[in-house]
Amino acid sequence: MSTVQTVLGTITPNLLGRTLTHEHVALDFEHFYRPPPPDFECELKAKISMSTLGYVRLYPYSSKENVRFYDGEALEAAKKDVLLYKKHGGGSIVENSSYGLKRNLEFIVELAKSTGVHFIAGTGHYIHAMQDASHASLSVEQMSDLYSKDIITGLQVNGKMVKCGFIGEVASVYPIHDFEKNAIKAAGEIQEVLGCGVSMHPHRVTKAPFEIMRLYLEAGGRADKCVMSHLDRTIFDIDELLEFAKLGCYIQYDLFGTECSFYQLNTSVDMISDGQRIDNLIKLIKEGLVDKLLMSHDIHTKHRLTSYGGHGYHHIHTNILPRMFDRGVTLEQVEQMTVTNPANWLAFDP
């Protein structure tokens, strides 16, 4: 029987409830720090406060405090928001911190125990530039062995074995680095063997998701067990997105709550708004793709947590879904995207 592998053990898919499929509760994002504009250097070097928050929202990657999503203050704020998520009907969170992002499995396990929210942890590799020496030269075979071990055997956390429940996020730049090609191929190989879900992080160019899927499918991975993340900042043309959808993977809009059009990590494009995300999802629903859609926030900086003036993990449930209902999306369609699709993606028979 297919089950979902959480950090506290296996559960049946029907117990997941509403699920956020791409989040982080602790990670190190300092690699993406950008020097602040000279005019705002003082404000962005200061501690985040009401007087500096406006600058941080415009230049989130220019505040070192903001990208240090791993210190005690960040963990306390993340726990508060997971509890708010639970309060507002949240059931499960898929934690996408992989090798290179310094995932904190001990904290994830503690959150699962203390909040009652199901957490599914990922294995896999982030971009090559963020790997330490022990991982930077791994072969496809070595990666495959590692991913399989993390899922089948688990990792030791405080004397107990904690198993990962999917492969992800598997991240790449563009052109895709050889190390990252190995990670994509290893994910495809292990997916074919174990049947588990996979989550991909494409670079910020339209060609990247297509190339990732080619490598993954050629390695044996199933399209219907693969999520392509961050498509709301990658493929902006709806016809091109429909063309990509023909490959059969899940289409994930996972930057809900990111409302600043100026996108520091790709200044050549404007980040779309939540209203535009809703409009695009409705277009995809009308094209018959509701069974391939997923939603999340990809919280990875402090300023998106409520303790720092942000929206928290409950934003989709409390703010986005009501707006979708107002625009004609049905409860059945919302349940498909937030409950059924995540369960179908995560369930496998290890």
From Swiss-Prot:
Q: Which UniProt keywords apply?
A: Hydrolase, Metal-binding
EC main group = hydrolase
One GO BP annotation is: catabolic process
Q: Where would you find the membrane-spanning parts of this chain?
A: none
**A molecular-function term among this protein's GO annotations:** zinc ion binding
Q: Does the keyword Membrane apply?
A: no
What InterPro entries does the record tag this protein with? Answer: AryldialkylPase_Zn-BS (IPR017947), Metal_Hydrolase (IPR032466), Phosphotriesterase (IPR001559)
Q: Which family does it belong to?
A: Belongs to the metallo-dependent hydrolases superfamily. Phosphotriesterase family.
Which protein, by its recorded name, is this?
Answer: Phosphotriesterase-related protein
Q: Which organism is it from?
A: Drosophila erecta (Fruit fly)
